[in-house]
Curated annotation (Swiss-Prot):
It is a multi-pass membrane protein. Residues 32-611 form the Peptidase M2 domain. The keyword Signal applies. Pfam families: Peptidase_M2. Chloride 2 binds at Y218, R516. Zn(2+) binds at H377, H381, E405. This is Angiotensin-converting enzyme-like protein Ace3. GO terms for cellular component: acrosomal membrane; acrosomal vesicle.
Amino acid sequence: MNLPWALLLVLLSHRQLLPWLRTVGETSLNDFYSEAQAKLFLQFYEQTAQVVLNEFMEATWNYVTNITKQNQKNMLQKEADRSQFMLYFSTRARMFRTDHFLNQDVKRMLRKLQNIDKSALPTEDLLEYNRLLTYMETAYNRAEVCLDEGPCLTLEPDLQEIMATSRDQKELLWAWQGWRDAVGRQLRPVFEDYVRLSNKAAQYNGYKDMGALWRSKYESDTLEEDLEQLYKELQPLYLNLHAYVRRSLYRYYGPELIDLRGPIPAHLLGNMWAQSWNNILDLVLPYPTKAPEDITAIMKIQHWRPEKMFEEANLFFTSMGMLPAPPAFWIKSMMEKPADGREVECHTSSWNFYKFNDFRVKKCTEVTLEDLLSVFHQMGHIQYFLQYQNLSVIYQEGASPAFEEAVGSVIALSVSSHKYLLARGLLSQPHQDSEEEVNFLLGIALEKIAFIPFSYLVDKFRWKIFDGTISKITYNQEWWNFRLKYQGLCPPVPRSDDDFDPGAKFHIPANVPYIRYFLGLILQFQLHEALCEASGHVGPLHQCDNYNSKVAGKILGDLLKLGSSRPWREVLQEVTGESNISTKAFLTYFKPLMDWLVTENVKQGDTLGWPDFSCSFEEKITSKVSFLGTDTEPEQAYLGQWVLLSMSFFMLVLILALGFRLHYLEKQLLDEDTMILKTLPYSYFLGIAMEPHQAARKQWLLLGLCCILMLCCIGLLIRIVTQNTENTPWMKNEGQS
């Protein structure tokens, strides 16, 4: 049934539409838009939203776990229905004058209901936007990098495995460049339209641009300033880690690839996006003779399977007195990549289906320590869903997006501890000495500290695109300017604005805000410290393990039960005693490592940062091309080239016709009677009377000149075409560095 009619039926069946119909012709709407009516309005929204949202989530799940045209069509239809539904209720929520409402909960729910993101777009724009988003995400999910003579490789697990385990810089370069060429260049032509429609949606919601709408989720007027301050407080940690890792890579790869005062090539850090460096721990280990045990290898020896990894995470939460994953979770989740040949979206995510106890995870799990920690993170999302499922649909989200990301990572900090891994049989050495402790902390730092600048810059970059600071012709150049400024990284081969390297990161084509990960990274340590103090932990923060701590579980569960029903600052205040996100716990956790890094870098004489360095970039300040000595737009140049070609063809046909006509006339003149020639002694050439044989000679000369001009025209055209399509140097030589 079409949604508007279904909605009308439901409205009538609940007797909620009649008050709205009766208002027509009334002298005053004050009674109708009263606080009491607002409560009835919200009750009805609750009853209908669960059905509409569940249908949309089911259709989307069906598509991402089985990418077909029919499933895509169904998903887009349900998305259109959901958007129409949200627009209906958002429009009516704006009609309530909440200034004099006494119930703060009603005011908060109405305010949240008014912000409906892309659903505010007009129908045609919304359909175009949804098609665009689907195209970008599908292009990302289906992208492959093909060997010259061999199979084509997908991102997960193939290319990620190469980036994590290979130490051959040429192979790493092949995977790194191949992925960006396969994805980014598909997305580059459509990204401008995505930005335009995103901003249009934001403006319909009352915001200047989409960046402003995204920032509004944090209910803070000083968010950007607060973020900059947090980043500055953590920057010394990153700079010291960067300098240490750079020197370690210099020892392995040599001066041909690494400059001890410069940025690091982005393909050498063990991760497709260089956001986490833990896969190169073996290259940078401070004390190689005391290398940590290979937990991934131990898991495989013990025959761990993806489902066991999820069971282990579930056990951790229940040990703290929290809720177990429901039976439907184990049946409906996609815990590993299907073996039946289906195309799926492998990017890890957790799903709330707005139906009692229907929560799922989608993950192409591999048996590795990295994926084990990721599983714990996802089960943190599931725990959040379980805890707040009794709240209104409007409140079924984290206190802020950062809280959603922090919850699972809080548990992962305990899981990473030596104490927990030993208890679960994943380590055999009962104690750590000081050198082993430094090795351990560096392993954590390669994941957490290395992530600081990347998690900060992704949205900072997008916000500047949305507000127009970064123009479409410099997307890629500005991306690498950000990567250099904040991460100290450069592309291993020159890139141009024909490329679109931001699109090689899932969250860009999938339209997922990213600043949540930066704030969540800091918040997880702040929450971890509070839970450890509550559970009575004594000793360094990195040794704390909250497994079996019912006290910590009670505090965390109470936080999760609130959903987004209260401002995040109030929630944080109750748990930590602070109303602001603070870096103090983060710095405390890594203080032993920071002291060691500073000492080591001073001893080696290492430079912090990358002063006076820039990345090699094939600059294209303008998209104009040269045509006949003038700069013009590519489309105009191509049109001009086709006009020249058409003119050349026309001239060729004309010259051939004239030649045949001339030959015929000349033959006719030679065959005519001599007496006739005497009566017509002259022919004309360009209006001048002359002997027939002289006129014929000049006509042949003119024909030859026209042929020469035609050949020159064709030669010029060929030169223009070859000039514009010439390959860039780094595309010719894959091994160039």
